[in-house]
Amino acid sequence: MSRSAAEFLKPQNVASTHYLDNRVYWDHEIFEEEKKRIFSKVWKFVCHVSEIPSTFDYRTIKVADTPLVVIRGKDEKVRTFVNACSHRGIQIVRRPRGNAKTMECIFHRWNYDSTNGELTGAPRKEAYGPSNFDLKQCGLREVRTETYLGLVFVNLDDSAVSLSEFIGDALEMEKDILGAEELEVFDYYEQVLDTNWKNWQETNLDLYHEFMHFANRKTGLTVKEYYQRAWKLYPNGHAAIERYRAQYSNYAGWQDRDDGIRLPGLHPNEFQLVNLFPDLAINARGTVIRIDSQTPISPGKTLVQYRGLGLKRDSERERVQRVRDYTSIWGPFGTNLAEDTLATSLHAKTIQTGSVPFTYLTRDEGGMTQDDLGLRTFYREWERLMSRQANQIR
């Protein structure tokens, strides 16, 4: 039965944890608070160690609007610095990736050591003496950086807990995949989506939406074991789903895949998914790993970065096969990823206008596969950090 305006604007009589006020997706005040209370306070994934393999290799990124450069020093330690000159705040490193023995500001040619961030040179520096300006105190700001299972994380909050305490046991089911052999990123793709960052993260927490995916309907939803997996919840908003073996032979082309290149710890048909709050998702499937991470741009615009990982020791033939396995499903023109990007953009077309007041997280299957438990866990942590309820913004 259809509803009147009054009925439509009133939430159903469900628990407060089971629905959202949709202003969490489009309210500018909420978005600014998220940057301060979440992205400036928690550990944020920035890259895989294989992306900066050599001394002085770097990558640039933004976290909570703060420009950062992640760089491997001459001591082989990975560090992160705020990518801004201590003099006038000019952005120093301008390329998304590269190699720099020193980092030089183009404005006044101030130079910084790429290992420790120390200011190593400034033209005509004697003129700073009369003003009592101490150039020794002009090093770059270093940001906390830690690595776990090849994943590089940063934290803008110097008083935050350690990375290991933040992650806890959330990657326990991924250790044999991520840590058994040396991996490397073989595919990198990014796109700006017209959607809120939480909408994209939800695609990796909401397994009920797999009815949308043609490939999933053919290979997963036909398997009894698919529905018998339990969600595993961890502190700090992390969630993972137990593994299962899909019937990939039902999907045209899978029979041509080489099981000999499967990842350590995975059966050729096995699938594993882990979500680390707030924005990291690790999908492992037989022969490939996909890592999703995000940079929120505005309430309705998000930069999503996708990384494909495989074994570094691959032969040329094995790498060609692994790339094919990855791109056919998870590449920009693959059967799966494009469907998710379409869904999130269609969601934004109504949510961002304020046309729909509520989102419901009401599926309850005893914590099994298509339960909304993962979503509710995410928003419970969101509420804790934001100090507000997600179902009642004002």
From Swiss-Prot:
The way its activity is modulated is described as: Inhibited by o-phenanthroline.
Quickly give the catalysed reaction.
2-aminobenzenesulfonate + NADH + O2 + 2 H(+) = 2,3-dihydroxybenzenesulfonate + NH4(+) + NAD(+)
- Into which EC class is this enzyme placed? oxidoreductase
Under CDD domains, the record lists: RHO_alpha_C, Rieske_RO_Alpha_N
Q: Which Pfam family, any one, appears in the UniProt record? A: Rieske
Record note on cofactor = Binds 1 [2Fe-2S] cluster per subunit. Binds 1 Fe cation per subunit.
What InterPro entries has UniProt attached to this entry? Rieske_2Fe-2S, Rieske_2Fe-2S_sf, Ring-hydroxy_dOase_2Fe2S_BS, Ring_hydroxy_dOase_asu_C_dom, Rng_hydr_dOase-A
Q: What Enzyme Commission number(s) apply to this enzyme?
A: 1.14.12.14
Cofactors demanded by this protein: [2Fe-2S] cluster; Fe cation
Q: Which GO terms describe its molecular function?
A: 2 iron, 2 sulfur cluster binding; 2-aminobenzenesulfonate 2,3-dioxygenase activity; iron ion binding
Name the residues that bind Fe cation.
Answer: 209, 213
Q: How does activity depend on pH?
A: Optimum pH is 7.5.
UniProt KW keywords: 2Fe-2S, Dioxygenase, Iron, Iron-sulfur, Metal-binding, NAD, Oxidoreductase, Plasmid
Per UniProt, residues of the Rieske domain are: 43-154
In the induction comment, the record states: Part of the abs operon that is induced during growth with 2-aminobenzenesulfonate (ABS) as carbon source.
Q: How do changes in temperature affect this protein's function?
A: Optimum temperature is 35 degrees Celsius.
> Which residues participate in [2Fe-2S] cluster binding?
85, 87, 105, 108
Its subunit composition reads: Heterotetramer with a alpha2beta2 structure.
User: What family does the entry list?
Assistant: Belongs to the bacterial ring-hydroxylating dioxygenase alpha subunit family.
**Function field:** Alpha subunit of the oxygenase component of the 2-aminobenzenesulfonate 2,3-dioxygenase system (deaminating) (ABSDOS). Can use 2-aminobenzenesulfonate (ABS), benzenesulfonate (BS), 4-toluenesulfonate (TS), 2-nitrobenzenesulfonate, 3- and 4-aminobenzenesulfonates, 4-chloro- and 4-hydroxybenzenesulfonates and pyridine-3-sulfonate as substrates. No desulfonation of ABS to aminocatechol or aminophenol detected.
Q: What is this protein called?
A: 2-aminobenzenesulfonate 2,3-dioxygenase subunit alpha
Gene name on record? absAa
